């Protein structure tokens, strides 16, 4: 469980306190029985209620022998409007799992310690989140840490004599403290940028603390970033994967962007630092000791400044997620070459700790590295990457010889290498099934795939999923574009079905074989819609030229790609071309707002979730300013900056409102600081002022996503009521 998941879990727990449910007497939220599943499935089809009833598998860790695992699953109660994370053990020999959690308090982050005789985990059973231990059968639970504040995550050293605890510390770099004699004042005085991030006002940031562990208790905690105003792990999504112990336990490698305020807001330049436990000295592994930060123009895109290019061994983009080789000779991490560009190709960098030489071992791979882990012999890696709408597992050695390990219409994510060089532990999902845990074991030229968990079997046994097909579409400029088409269950080609164009967000996130608990294609298909999901310009997995063509051209070829996709689908006799809808979130919401004024009457309904309506407004409202700086070309007041900037703001969706002629539903979370909810309010107001049928759905307590069960159900019901009203009449 990473920091993001822990924060979400804490938020859900806090939200529960406001509910009229006695936490002490609340029912245990866990895996649903087959009869409970039957109450949420409708005519053998997936429903929003069934979707929220499914278990969501988190981390899975093996013991050193590889014969026992521990993993977490999060369940949701619509009635109680909260989640509950529980731990399971898994016997690799008998293939049996056992629930270890007996409390209504959430537990997670399970790992084996003491040679596999104990499981360490996080629990809030004592009133705050602390590190506990228990036997592999769940007995003899005992609290190990007694910190005065919450432990968000932990990481034991290889010899287990020390442990890293992730805890929050006060931050006053952007928000100053209010006067002490005004304890009930709610005003927020901000002195610099990054006063808000994702969905929080930044009054606290995570820091890594190192503590001693004598086998009985965790004590002697000290902050390795003491008096430094920087976050580690990096907000908003970084977790303990951004830190690593050296095999001898003498050093800690950590990820950090040592910037604050405006400097932080315009830069993606994070580095890998090596902290020596004994001396307390820190060394930057990404830059030379005499490196001086170049001066940057904050209102001009870094793409136009010399600071954004890697020079020699000095890296200036995202460097994160360090891992030492098992033999201690190397350290590896993921690295981007350009500052201010969060979608640059992620390469796997390997540093020889003795010679200081760096090697990029995935240069021959045409896409970016998502996750990686060392092989036990320290001679290579497993890693995942997106290619042609699928996320697969690959291998590479230290020479950079890359080979694809997995095939099929799936998305994989790595968990850990199996001990003794036997393969790798992964999670796998598709557009038709949620995450389950598998082992991959190479055998000669083949691969043995073994499924370990069947968390949601009771659902799949009662649900018929729609067929998912790959479809290649010719774009308006003559390129070939991969689209996924999802058909309703029991599809009949002799009938006509309304169709939806799905507009992906990001704007550089892949339309791979993803499974979503909100934007779920199978729920849409279960409502008798055909969905086409294009891998339009700007998405990874089709080479860097395809990926980067969207930067500075939001309203250009990528929009034509959308229209090419829906026009191609409409050639099929079973598609009702008079009843088409376009839906999307984030950049997908931008796409919907833009298409609303440029669709030539193709669509009969639009839905935009957390979308950008006004690009000029977005530039000064969002918090991570490197993003609009790069993609829009510069600040809107830099009149003569460049053609890219002028086009980005001159083609903003709000400038086409005079052409809007179609009903539109605008959805937004009011805790969304990435794209402010005022964008949806503005779009809704414009639509109603023009006399269009429109609806506005606001969530005062949600961010860029919808995380609470009852809000999620309301989202789905509103979504389909709107589509059905306009596309099924």
Show where each model-derived region lies.
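Short loop/turn segments that connect beta-strands within beta-propeller blades
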Residues: 91-95, 135-139, 213-216, 276-280, ...
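Conserved beta-propeller blade repeats
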Residues: 55-69, 104-122, 141, 148-163, ...
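Cap/lid segment of the alpha/beta-hydrolase catalytic domain
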Residues: 260, 446, 455-578, 585-586, ...
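A short helix->beta-strand "capping" segment at the edge of beta-propeller domains
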Residues: 34-55, 219-229
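Short glycine/acidic-enriched loop and turn motifs that connect beta-strands
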Residues: 75-79, 125-128, 170-173, 259-262, ...
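Active-site-proximal cap/loop segments of hydrolase catalytic domains
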Residues: 520, 525, 533-729
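Predominantly five- to eight-bladed beta-propeller fold
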Residues: 26-35, 84-85, 168-227, 255-273, ...
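Beta-strand-rich domains and repeat architectures in extracellular enzymes and scaffolds
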Residues: 49-85
């Amino acid at each position: 469980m990473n920091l993001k998941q822990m924060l979400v879990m804490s938020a859900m727990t806090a939200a529960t306190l406001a509910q009229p449910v006695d936490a002490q007497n609340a029912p245990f939220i866990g895996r649903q029985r087959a009869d409970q599943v039957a109450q949420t499935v409708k005519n053998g089809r997936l429903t929003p209620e069934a979707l929220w009833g499914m278990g969501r598998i988190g981390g899975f860790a093996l013991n050193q022998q590889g014969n026992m695992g521990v993993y977490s699953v999060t369940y949701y109660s619509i009635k109680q409007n909260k989640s509950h994370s529980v731990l399971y053990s898994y016997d690799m020999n008998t293939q049996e799992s056992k629930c270890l959690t007996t409390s209504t308090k959430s537990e997670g982050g399970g790992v084996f310690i003491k040679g596999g005789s104990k499981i360490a985990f996080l629990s809030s059973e004592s009133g705050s989140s602390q590190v506990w231990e228990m036997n592999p059968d769940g007995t003899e639970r005992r609290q190990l840490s007694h910190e005065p504040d919450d432990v968000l995550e932990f990481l034991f050293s290889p010899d287990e004599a020390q442990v890293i605890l992730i805890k929050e510390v006060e931050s006053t770099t952007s928000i100053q403290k209010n006067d002490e004699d005004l304890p009930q004042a709610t005003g927020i005085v901000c002195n610099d940028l990054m006063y808000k991030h994702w969905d929080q006002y930044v009054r606290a940031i995570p820091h890594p603390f190192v503590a001693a562990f004598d086998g009985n208790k965790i004590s002697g905690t000290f902050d390795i970033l003491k008096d430094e105003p920087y976050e580690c792990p990096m907000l908003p999504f970084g977790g303990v994967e951004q830190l690593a112990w050296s095999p001898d336990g003498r050093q800690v490698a950590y990820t950090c962007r040592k910037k604050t305020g405006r400097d932080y807001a315009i830069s993606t330049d994070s580095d890998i630092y090596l902290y020596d436990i004994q001396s307390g000295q820190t060394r930057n592994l990404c830059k030379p000791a005499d490196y001086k930060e170049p001066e940057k123009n904050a209102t001009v895109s870094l793409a136009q400044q010399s600071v954004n290019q890697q020079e020699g061994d000095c890296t200036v983009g995202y460097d994160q997620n360090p891992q030492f080789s098992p033999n201690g000779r190397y350290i590896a991490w993921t690295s981007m070459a350009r500052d201010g560009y969060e979608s640059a190709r992620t390469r796997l960098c390997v540093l020889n700790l003795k010679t200081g030489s760096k090697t990029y071992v995935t240069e021959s791979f045409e896409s970016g590295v998502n996750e990686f882990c060392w092989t036990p012999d320290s001679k290579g890696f497993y890693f995942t990457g997106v290619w042609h709408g699928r996320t697969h597992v690959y291998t590479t050695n230290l020479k950079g010889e890359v080979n694809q390990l997995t095939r099929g219409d799936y998305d994989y994510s790595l968990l850990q290498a199996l001990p003794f060089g036997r393969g790798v532990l992964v999670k796998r999902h598709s557009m038709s099934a949620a995450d389950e845990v598998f082992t991959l074991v190479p055998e000669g030229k083949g691969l043995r795939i073994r499924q370990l968990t069947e968390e949601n079997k009771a659902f799949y046994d009662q649900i018929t999923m729609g067929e998912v097909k790959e479809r290649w579409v010719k774009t308006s400029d003559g390129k070939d574009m991969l689209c996924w088409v999802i058909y309703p269950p029991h599809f009949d080609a002799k009938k006509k079905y309304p169709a939806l164009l799905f507009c992906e967000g990001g704007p550089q996130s892949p339309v791979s074989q993803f499974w979503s608990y909100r934007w779920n294609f199978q729920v849409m298909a279960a409502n008798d819609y055909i969905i086409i999901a294009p891998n339009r310009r700007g998405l990874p997995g089709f080479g860097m030229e395809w990926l980067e063509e969207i930067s500075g051209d939001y309203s250009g070829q990528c929009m034509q790609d959308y229209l090419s996709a829906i026009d191609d689908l409409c050639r099929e006799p079973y598609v009702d071309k008079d009843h088409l809808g376009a839906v999307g979130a984030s950049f997908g919401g931008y796409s919907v707002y833009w298409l609303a004024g440029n669709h030539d009457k193709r669509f009969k309904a639009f839905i935009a979730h957390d979308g950008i309506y006004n690009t000029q407004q977005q530039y000064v409202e969002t918090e991570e300013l490197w993003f609009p700086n790069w993609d829009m070309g510069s600040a809107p007041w830099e009149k003569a900056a460049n053609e890219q900037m002028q086009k980005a703001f001159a083609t903003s969706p709000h400038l086409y409102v005079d052409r809007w002629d179609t009903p539109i539903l605008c959805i937004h979370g009011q805790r969304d600081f990435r794209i402010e909810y005022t964008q949806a309010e503005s779009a809704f107001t414009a639509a109603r002022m023009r006399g269009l049928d429109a609806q506005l759905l606001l969530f005062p307590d949600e961010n860029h996503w919808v995380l609470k069960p009852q809000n999620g159900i309301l989202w789905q019901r509103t979504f389909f009521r709107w589509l059905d009203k306009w596309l099924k009449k």
